[in-house]
Structures are given as structure tokens and as C-alpha cells.
Amino acid sequence: GFSYSSDAIFPTDAEVFNRVISEDKRSTSAIISVSQIISQVSSFQIALGLTEQSGFLSDPYKLKDIRPDNRTQIALTNSYRHFFINANAAWHVNYRYYHDDFGISSHTFDMRWYQNLRQSIQLVPSVRFYSQSAASFFTNIDNFVKPADEYQSSDHRLSAFGAFSGGLSFVANLGSWTATLTAERYVSNDSYSAYKVSQPSTALVRYNRISVGLDYTF
């Protein structure tokens, strides 16, 4: 697969808060995958993705956020599927390794159990663990003394942290319509990271989420 995007950036209140007036950024992605049928009830897939970003990659809404204008990202994803005939259920397991030249490496592991209750109803519990290292230029406090051309960012998404999430979805297939009700709990903390944390972020989040979705297929 291949994709390309080009974005024009026009931050609001740019002149009031001394933000950039306008910038642009570009992203090119390519992915290759291989699937293998293991048996009548199980399969495995491996995928390798590469993304190149260039242009304005900083956050214009932060007071001191200066990032490199190029970023190379690579991701390796492994997916395993198995159907349990007697239980009338499917087990999905995924693992993803990610690395970029900002200095971030991450591991993502998630599992889902698709339990068929009736022909048109599914119950889907899920768990997910995520861990990442910090970007080489991450700082938990903005340093306004640093030169304007020296990289730094206090964005918590660039810090070293880990996160656990668990959820439960109820899926009903109603002919051409599919209704989904999902409840999820998400907790992130620097102590959950599998990597060294030299500067913990103070902006990591935790939340409860309930969502309702309705899809139509034609």
C-alpha cells in the first residue's frame, strides 16, 4: 500500500500569540504485508510500514515547541487470528514495534476476544498495553533560554510512558446496519514505561470513555 498527504497549517490567533502565520507539512507512507493461513481456523500476518514526514512538524499552539523538520518512522506489526469452534469465538492478538529518528521506540500489545452470542450479536472484551521511550529532545519544562534553533518539546506524547486500557464492546448486526456500544478505561503513567524515564511528564492522562457507533453497508 502507498499513501501521500500534504497539509497547509494556519494556526488561529497567530499574530496575537506570536505563532507561525502559515506552514505546510507532507507525509509519504508505504506498507508491505504477508499473510499465511496456518490451518482452517488460524492465520498469521506480518506487515512492515515506513513513513517519511517533512515540513513543519512542531506544535504551533505550544509556547516553546521546536522539532526537526524531517521524521522517518518504521513499524513492524504481527497479527494472529484463531477461531475456537466449540466456543464459537475468535481470538485476535497483535504486537507492534515502532521506531523513529526522533529517538522514540515503542511496543504495543493488544488482545481481543470476539464472542458470538447469537448469529447477529457479538461481545468483544479487549486489553491493550503500550510502552514508549522519550524523544531525544523531550523536556518536561519549557526552556526559554535555549536558542530558537535548538530542538525541544514538552508534549507529553513525546515523553517516556506506558499505558494500559481495557474495554468491552457490544456489537449487533442488523442487516445492512451494524450498531456498536463500547466502554473503555485508559490509564497512562511514566512508571508503566519499559524504558528509562529521565524526565517524567506531568500531562499524562487517564479517562473513561463510552461510545456509540452506527455503520451502514451497501
Regions found by a protein language model. Give the residues of each.
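Solenoidal tandem-repeat scaffolds enriched in leucines and small polar residues
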Residues: 2-65
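Outer-membrane beta-barrel channels and translocator barrels
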Residues: 37-41, 85-87, 118-120, 174-177
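Outer membrane beta-barrel transmembrane domains
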Residues: 47-81, 96-110, 114, 120-217
